[in-house]
Regions:
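Conserved acidic catalytic loop of the alpha/beta-hydrolase fold
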Residues: 113-130
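Glycine-rich "HGGG/HGxG" loop immediately N-terminal to the catalytic nucleophile
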Residues: 72-78, 95-109, 167
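Short beta-strand element of the alpha/beta-hydrolase
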Residues: 60-69
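A catalytic-pocket lid/entrance helix-loop region that shapes and gates access to the active site
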Residues: 153-202
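Conserved hydrolase catalytic core segment
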Residues: 129-167
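Conserved alpha/beta-hydrolase
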Residues: 84-99
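Conserved alpha/beta-hydrolase "acid-adjacent" motif
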Residues: 292-298
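Short beta-strand/loop motif that positions the catalytic acidic residue
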Residues: 285-287
């Protein structure tokens, strides 16, 4: 799931006072646009090399920004969520997406690989501990990384909670959000023959992994358009246009579907069942009440498992 919008009036890692009028533009409440001070590639396996960037203050507090999708890629706008004078803002493209290579590759691409890659980046930069910031799928990966390396997390700031449980996948990709966005859901559903519509994720996976490039691209466009149409409170034509960028859509859709059909390579409910070792980590959960992609119930259930967390809806 993609990082789509400002969903509350506070971010733990921002020292900027935050008040937001209903008609405020996002650039009015974020820090100014900045460019990276350093970029590079890190070889994480014989097959995969991941892109990374650092922006802000090289001597500032390190924060790792974990993007959505999976397959969404890092974004320049993510740099604007942090005070560039106080934070060393680190982003990377997860395996197979963005500037990482090979593009749209599914082999050696799973949650455990991603956790390992985050730790490889930390070691590569010589960072002892860092803040962790992630939204949507980025919240999923942030939590699993923290559960595997609780001693490396200074804090967790999570937006749009998505834990990739079967119930969440069913809500968005099969039945649930479809009742709120029937007009956007219909093209996504009707791309699949009626006799396969009982399991849309499986049907899309078959097409997204087809040997026929045109079949892959057509499926990627419809998968991506469905998500882009529902990821923002107010429809954004530029956001919808991402589905027309088939280079982006193919990696985004293939990698997402690959993870989802495999239950993100962990048991269902893994995150909620493994919160005991991260209860000490300062955690802020920011959730949009009307988020169609990442329903509020997930943030609520996570907050109950992390009683010391701060939940902002």
């Amino acid at each position: 799931m993609m990082f789509g919008r400002i969903e509350a009036k506070y971010y733990q890692l921002s020292s900027k006072p935050f008040t937001m009028a209903a008609d405020a533009e996002i650039d009015d409440v974020l820090y100014s646009k900045i460019e990276p001070y350093s970029t590079g590639m890190l070889e994480v396996s014989d097959l995969h090399t991941i892109f990374w960037e650092r922006a802000g203050n090289p001597d500032g507090q390190p924060v790792i920004v974990i993007h959505g999708g999976p397959g969404g890629g890092s974004q320049p706008g993510y740099r604007q969520y942090f005070d560039p004078e106080k934070f060393d803002i680190i982003q990377f493209d997860q395996r197979g997406c963005g500037k990482s290579t090979p593009y749209a590759e599914l082999e050696e691409n799973n949650t455990h690989n991603s956790v390992s890659d985050i730790e490889s980046l930390r070691e590569h930069f010589g960072i002892d501990k860092w803040h962790i910031f992630g939204g949507s799928w980025g919240s999923t990966l942030s939590l699993i990384y923290a559960q595997n390396h609780p001693d490396k997390a200074l804090s967790l700031t999570l937006r749009g909670i998505f834990m990739c449980r079967k119930s969440e996948l069913q809500w968005f990709y099969q039945h649930g959000a479809s009742h709120v966005f029937p007009d956007a859901f219909e093209p996504y559903q009707n791309h699949i023959p009626e006799d396969e519509q009982h399991d849309l994720i499986s049907a899309y996976y078959e097409r997204l992994t087809s040997d026929n490039v045109e079949i892959r691209r057509a499926a990627a466009k419809e998968w991506t358009r469905w998500e882009m149409a529902t990821s923002r409170l107010f429809p954004d034509p530029e956001y919808l246009d991402k589905a027309e960028d088939l280079d982006f859509a193919v990696a985004f859709a293939r990698i997402e579907c690959h993870y989802f059909i495999n239950g993100i390579f962990v048991e269902d409910g893994h995150i909620l069942n493994n919160c005991n070792n991260i209860t000490h980590i300062p955690t802020t959960i920011v959730q949009g009440r009307y988020d169609m992609v990442c329903p509020t119930v997930s943030a609520w259930e996570l907050h109950k498992q992390l009683p010391n967390s701060r939940l902002i809806i």
